[in-house]
Amino acid sequence: MGHSRRPAGGEKKSRGFGRSKAVADVGDGRQTGGKPQVKKATFESTKKKEIGVSDLTLLSKISNEAINDNLKLRFEHDEIYTYIGHVLVSVNPFRDLGIYTDNVLQSYRGKNRLEVPPHVFAVAESAYYNMKSYKDNQCVIISGESGAGKTEAAKRIMQYIASVSGGTDSSIQHTKDMVLATNPLLESFGNAKTLRNNNSSRFGKYLELEFNTNGEPVGANITNYLLEKSRVVGQITNERNFHIFYQFTKAAPQKYRDLFGIQQPQSYLYTSRSKCFDVPGVDDSAEFRDTLNAMNVIGMTEGEQDEVFRMLAAILWIGNVQFAEDDSGNAVITDQSVVDYVAYLLEVDAAQVNKAFTIRVMETARGGRRGSVYEVPLNTVQALAVRDALAKAIYFNLFDWIVQRVNASLTARGEVANSIGILDIYGFEIFEKNSFEQLCINYVNEKLQQIFIQLTLKAEQDEYAREQIQWTPIKYFDNKVVCSLIEDKRPPGVFAALNDACATAHADSSAADNTFVGRLNFLSQNPNFENRQGQFIIKHYAGDVSYAVAGMTDKNKDQLLKDLLNLVGTSGNQFVHTLFPEQVNQDDKRRPPTASDKIKASANDLVATLMKAQPSYIRTIKPNDNKAPREYNVGNVLHQIKYLGLQENVRIRRAGFAYRQTFDKFVERFYLLSPKTSYAGDYTWTGDAESGARQILKDTSIPAEEYQMGITKVFVKTPETLFALEAMRDRYWHNMAIRIQRAWRNYLRYRTECAIRIQRFWRRTTGGLEFIKLRDQGHQLLNGRKERRRMSLLGSRRFLGDYIGVGNKGGPGEMVRNGAGISGSEEILFSCRGEVLVSKFGRSSKPAPRILALTNRHVYIIAQNLVNNQLVISSERTIPIGAIKAVGASNLKDDWFSIVVGSPQEPDPLVNCVFKTEFFTHLNNALRGQLNLKIADHIEYNKKPGKLATVKVVKDPAVARDDSYKSGTIHTGPGEPANSVSKPTPRPKQVSARPVTKGKLLRPGGPGGGPSKLAARPTPAAQPLPRATPQPAEPQPAARAVPQPVAAVAASHTRTGSTASVRAPPPPPPAAAPAPKKPTAKVLYDFNSQQSNELSIKAGEIVQIVSKEGNGWWLCMNMTTSAQGWTPEAYLEEQVAPTPKPAPPPPPAAPRSTPAPATNGAAAAAKAKPAPPAPPAKRPNMAARKAVPTPPPAPRDSAVSMNSHDSSGGSGRGTPNSMSNASLAGGLAEALRARQHAMQGKQDDDDDW
């Protein structure tokens, strides 16, 4: 009965876990299977704070007033939906709350009702997945009075199902579009503005969505009921005709205005009688465009649309036909031009229209033979009735044709497996004057209420009694007696009396009404009926309704005069014949079916259809009669709560069972949950279905009070228990899938590891070939003309190029690039740190650190300077590579070279770079092999513009490592022969083979499964760690570390010679230091806590001190109960921890040469107090550092890593660890100052002056 059961396919795994959360949330704390309470915290954290109760079955007091108060509280907080079990109660908010967006819709997809707040989407989700999982037809019955929101609920259900039903095929999507397009189309022709609702459905609609076996929509069918055709010809003040008339007259295109003479709605009687032309917040022109679009989606051709609008125009012009009395009192038409236009629209003869409106043809018959024919003139009242009858007949038949046309387009395009029906029919109506239309509407609502009673109340109790289930019976009101009062033939009901009156006195309307009143006297004995003068009262489930007798018989006849049928039969328009297909049988004397006969048959057919499906219910409530948002009329809502029977529904829900299923289907659904009924997914139980169901419930640990076993069914009390079973079933398949996934992932991991090993081997074999080729090009470029450095010939040496990372995004290299202004379009070929010879006024030239960068366009010499103690990076010199005339270098192993430009404004740079050969190679490639590399025993360059200078290069064996520049001479040590080439690449270190995978499903060692070397290697024995020398430390307030004896420490560091004949036994290890004790305090006085965060203590107790505060309170813990709280400091006396005993002395060692024991032995250490910690070292004096002798120069930094530097001295080429660090400038300042100190020890030369 609308249960949110889990589908067999398990589309959403999260649904099962959600049920676990529900069990933990609502259950009584017992373990109901597996791990249902694991997700409790997650579930609570995702739910927003609940207003009132979301399910009325959770009310502590069950009464109509309590239900009303809860609905009012939730309504005031914009929570319009509330559950009664699986029945949804909806309160119309009369405004958009933003709760029907796609995001909200997706949040309900695949969720049971307890995982998410109450919503109409949850009802749609339950119906759809129950249909898909259990192959049961579903229906959603939406009930409530007019204006309560039934139509909106039906549209939202269609919106949800269209969204989640899947199917990417174009035909399926087209079916969805057509189903959704039926809403604006049928609303425009079937809805109207009433006093209580701006978009009131004036017809009943049962939409049946048809699905294939995959749950994809393949078609639909619409059945319409009770179109209020009387609204076409008249409305009360402030109401409107059907929407389509105002849409058409306001927004009709010029084509229709020319063809059909369409004017504004004020020009027509049928649209202006009520003096209401507009609806607040509704744009009729925009609605008309939606209607035309819906017609196109449905597949109506342009010709069909033209005929529909022709009929609408004909109805409007028929209403403008007016009559007057002639001298004889007969009706005559006042404006013949209107009749002529009506005849043009209907394509009939105008004279025939005149005759049909003003004359009635009567025929007498005698003895079964045709008699005389008479033409009886009509008076004005009769003529108006004939005119209106024609207009109503055209519109009624036109509406039926539209529904049939929609059904033809929605015909199933595949095999239909199941269906979901949505019933949207206007609700119970009570007006000041109620007539035949209200009687029919209220009769249908009585039938729907009877279904609800039968399926939710009576059927519930009957099934419990039939299955011998113990439960508490609930009294309820069965409205079957009211339905019998209206529809029964024996004894005759209201409809039977009405039909009898119409048949007896069919000629005179007033006589027929009087006859009807007489027939109603026979119903006076019925307790639900009262007959009064000119009216009668029926006691409906929604309240007592008084119906006026006047005019009921005429409305019940529902017959179109044969004269009008003959008129439309002469039409030359084929569409008119389609609307009126029946032929007039002049000899048929049988009484045609009346309106009450038709509505009775339709209602019974509807009931039969609904009884074949599993229903879900939405009970809509109208909070006020003013259509005002945020207004809640307590009295009106309380009345609706009573007649909807919500209190009885809550009571029976609380007393009954949420789920029931036959034994065989229950076992079929859940046999996987018991190891005794299944193995590897196969059903293995050999007993009957009942015993199998019991075994499943036993193995899933369902408490006995949560279910009962009936005669043929198992009954589960709460939905949470069912959710737990479904969650376990989902986890079963989930676990099976995990096993398959684990094996597949293990194989993929194995395959990936194999590929990685092959790639690693290939990269190891061929990796770096490009850089090795560049290195070989460097050998060719030097061509045996220059001695080589030993490090340059290493086999692992590669020409990597951009050592500083100037071409990288992010990091220090990007800072250098941005500071130097290197364009992003330039490709970085080479970057490295080096030195440039800098000339200063009055001083000798000195090397200064710089960054050398080479791109495909320029050579950049980049400087790093301190400005206002901030590091500033800038390009000191930018040289286009095309302007380089030559590069000069010596034939020794030094790293100096000149870049000869010959600029008239700037000197040529003389550069010192450890990767000079790599620079030459990249520059030669950038110049496409046109580099002029001059190698000699000296280096030439323009020291000043136009002034050629020569730098001598001298081989000095005294230079151990790096070359040095002084007074125009470079001193360098001997190098490798000039014809030397790089050594072969060294072989990598051999490592043991690793298993391809460590998984349990595949054997280690590779595809063959052989043992790996790693697995065969024995595990090394654990070696004891040497004891560290004790370091002075701060004394701890709780406990002190036990000092080791000096002899033991000395013995642990004594190295025994290999020639010793006897090894003394090692001393025993010292005793382990006891764990530090927590500080404790003794309670001096009793203290009783006054607040929840305070701790009560008694004098003499020992408590543990957790923390101390400076405000006179200590946080303490009772060592017996572990309770914590705040206690006053004055009530406590802190206990001093005793000094631990020293370790026992070691046994005497054998007589051998061992160090003498120190004076501070173990006993002295035990007695000595711990020394206070040494004060922190003072900050070094920078002035004193200048007097320190210059340390030997450190190896030059090649800038391979940005993190290598020495701030204490050296060549000063180092840079800070990170250019993004805040101390970068300070570190660089230290480096620059260190270089200045180093240079002070060198003698200045006067080579510049």
Curated annotation (Swiss-Prot):
InterPro entries in the record: Fungal_myosin-I_SH3, Kinesin_motor_dom_sf, Myo1_CA, Myosin_head_motor_dom-like, Myosin_TH1, MYSc_Myo1, P-loop_NTPase, SH3-like_dom_sf
Feature: compositional bias, Pro residues: 1021-1035, 1064-1077, 1139-1150
Amino acid composition bias (Polar residues), ranges on this chain: 1200-1221
Main location class: cytoplasm
Low complexity bias spans: 1036-1051, 1151-1169, 1222-1231
Residue ranges occupied by any IQ domain in the UniProt entry: 734-754, 755-780
TH1 domain segment(s): 788-978
Binding site for ATP: G144, E145, S146, G147, A148, G149, K150, T151
Region of interest (Actin-binding), residue spans: 419-501
Gene Ontology MF terms: actin filament binding; ATP binding; hydrolase activity; microfilament motor activity
Leader peptide range in chain numbering: none
Record keyword Phosphoprotein present: yes
Gene Ontology terms: cellular component: actin cortical patch; actin cytoskeleton; cell tip; cytoplasm; myosin complex; plasma membrane
Family to which the UniProt record says this protein belongs: Belongs to the TRAFAC class myosin-kinesin ATPase superfamily. Myosin family.
Protein name: Myosin-1
Organism for this UniProt entry: Aspergillus fumigatus (strain ATCC MYA-4609 / CBS 101355 / FGSC A1100 / Af293)
Name of the coding gene: myoA
